[in-house]
A protein has these predicted regions:
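Hydrophobic side chains within alpha-helical segments
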Residues: 7, 80-83, 153, 160
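Sec-dependent signal peptide recognition
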Residues: 2-8
């Protein structure tokens, strides 16, 4: 299944090139935000802001926890964490982001996963950030050693949620409202599923939607 992507770019530019690459279509323009679509289904929302000295790249993958199968709860969120570590050709993703002085993060919800960077607006930084997002989507390294390290981070996040009355309440309400739908399950998943997920399964799929190649 093809993964739907949305790239949201906020640029500090005085003008935007009006000549589109072959196959790219301009879909709509509202309130200064213009939508473009590439032949592969990638959608780009471009928002030029001449007063802003920063550039923001927000990559949205329209796959989230509701796409997880039985025994896969928490895999979308765990994969988001893995997407900040390393590529198969040795790029250290988080280290690169920090070295460029970017404000960055990633989040997982029921319907989507997103990754973003905000950094000084230069052509070099924009090219680097787009290249990084491409590498993150198709070339992330997933193996048992990296998974074991990141599981410590995810496990701590899980335990913090267990001690949050607000999160416990929201999870109880959701599970009652959506008895037979993944909207009723926690995005971070269950401890049982998280503790037993093998690297091969995480790398192969999240709800049979995102494919990876395991080295």
């Amino acid at each position: 299944m093809r993964v739907k992507l949305i790239a949201v770019l906020t640029l500090a530019v005085s003008a935007v090139c009006q000549t589109l690459p072959p196959g790219v279509q301009k879909k709509a323009s509202v309130g200064g935000i213009t939508e473009y679509e590439y032949p592969n289904g990638l959608r780009v929302l471009l928002y030029p802001d001449p007063a802003n000295p920063k550039v923001t790249i927000n990559m949205i993958v329209q796959v989230g926890s509701r796409h997880e199968g039985y025994g896969e709860t928490g895999m979308a969120h765990l994969l988001e964490h893995m997407d900040f570590i390393e590529t198969n050709d040795g790029r250290q993703i988080k280290n690169e982001i920090v070295a460029h002085g970017a404000v960055w993060n990633g989040t997982t919800s029921e319907d989507r996963t997103n990754y973003y960077e905000t950094l000084t607006a230069t052509d070099e930084n924009l090219k680097w950030a787009l290249d990084l997002e491409a590498a993150r989507l198709v070339n992330v390294k997933i193996n048992k050693q990296l998974l074991d390290v990141e599981m410590t981070v995810v496990r701590n996040e899980f335990e913090r949620g267990e001690n949050s009355p607000q999160r416990v309440l929201s999870e109880r309400v959701a599970s009652t409202a959506f008895l037979w739908h993944n909207y009723g399950k926690s995005t971070i998943g269950s401890r049982e599923d998280l503790e037993k997920v093998p690297a091969e399964r995480l790398g192969r799929s999240t709800g049979n939607t995102i494919s990876r190649t395991i080295p």
